């Protein structure tokens, strides 16, 4: 059985490394990129089963909600489940994110990093 493939988009180097390492140790195949602006090139190279997207990117970067909207404009990308990572807590508009196809929202910091792996497996197509 092929492992679930994940595209992880996280700007914080340490967090990106920890999340990628945790998911890989659990048997998931992870491609990790630091900027949301790189997501479209990464998707053209191969479609993941799940996208894990940090909603809050640094100022001047493509923002998470904009990425979600663009993902839904391309037929090949529209059905890819997206797990949002957000330090914004209740500020995240859950109606908007659901409409944009978000499968799950996890708050940051994650106290139990294995929760990410469980969530990715649960939403994988």
Name each model-derived stretch.
Residues 17-25:
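Charged docking surfaces used in two-component/phosphorelay signaling
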Residues 41, 63-78:
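Short amphipathic alpha-helix used as the core "switch/output" element in two-component signaling
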Residues 10:
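Conserved acidic carboxylate
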Residues 47-49, 76-81:
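His-Asp phosphorelay/catalytic-motif detector in bacterial-type signaling
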Residues 62, 66, 89-106, 110, ...:
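Alpha4 helix (beta4-alpha4-beta5 surface) of REC/receiver domains from two-component response regulators
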Residues 27-36, 42:
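Short hydrophobic/Thr-rich beta-strand motif most characteristic of the beta2 strand and flanking loop
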Residues 46-57:
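Active-site beta3 strand of CheY-like receiver
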């Amino acid at each position: 059985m092929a492992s679930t493939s994940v595209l992880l988009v996280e700007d914080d180097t340490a967090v990106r490394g920890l999340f990628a390492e945790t998911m890989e140790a659990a048997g998931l195949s992870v491609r990790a990129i630091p900027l949301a602006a790189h997501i479209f090139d990464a998707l053209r190279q191969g479609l993941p089963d799940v996208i894990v997207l940090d909603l809050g990117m640094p100022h001047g970067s493509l923002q998470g909600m904009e990425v979600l909207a663009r993902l839904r404009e391309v037929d090949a990308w529209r059905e890819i489940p997206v797990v949002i990572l957000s330090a914004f807590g209740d500020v995240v508009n859950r109606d908007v994110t659901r409409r944009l196809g978000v499968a799950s929202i996890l708050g940051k910091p994650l106290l139990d990093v294995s929760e990410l792996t469980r969530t990715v497996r649960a939403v994988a197509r």
